[in-house]
């Protein structure tokens, strides 16, 4: 039974997204259906948590919109995700960045930048 579950998860897993870690600033293009029309909606923010593995992996993204903190839990393997772009890699010393919830203004999105070395 366990092998069957692994086969199903492996077949549904999406590998077309970059590696996402807590502290990264990401821009996610989501498909939104309104009536008969379908459009893309961008959600840009800091990844404060990732959870699960394989087909059940989710990330929590937080942004500040008009002075109000907005968090969205996004299943990474959802068919409603068009693309995920990592805008900035952040250096986080924690696995969960829930302390950002208590911060206001620019400090709420401030995570130290991480140097990324491209392999040649």
Curated annotation (Swiss-Prot):
This protein is located at the 30S-50S ribosomal subunit interface and may play a role in the structure and function of the aminoacyl-tRNA binding site. InterPro entries: Ribosomal_bL19, Ribosomal_bL19_CS, Ribosomal_bL19_sf, Translation_prot_SH3-like_sf. Belongs to the bacterial ribosomal protein bL19 family. One of its GO terms (cellular component) is cytosolic large ribosomal subunit. Keywords: Ribonucleoprotein, Ribosomal protein. GO terms for biological process: translation. The keyword Ribonucleoprotein applies. SUPFAM superfamilies: Translation proteins SH3-like domain. The keyword Protein biosynthesis does not apply. This is Large ribosomal subunit protein bL19. Coiled coil: none annotated. GO terms for molecular function: structural constituent of ribosome. The gene is rplS. It comes from the Bacteria.
């Amino acid at each position: 039974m366990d092998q069957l579950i692994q086969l199903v998860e492996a077949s549904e897993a999406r590998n077309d997204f970059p590696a996402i870690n807590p502290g990264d600033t990401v821009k996610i293009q989501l498909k939104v259906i309104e009536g008969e029309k379908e459009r893309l909606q961008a959600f840009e923010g800091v990844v404060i948590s990732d959870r699960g593995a394989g087909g059940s992996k989710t990330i929590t993204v937080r942004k500040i919109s008009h002075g109000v903190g907005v968090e969205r839990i996004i299943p990474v393997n959802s068919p409603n995700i068009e693309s995920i772009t990592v805008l900035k890699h952040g250096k986080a010393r924690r696995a969960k960045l829930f302390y950002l919830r208590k911060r206001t203004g620019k400090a709420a999105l401030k995570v130290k930048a991480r140097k990324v070395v491209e392999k040649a």
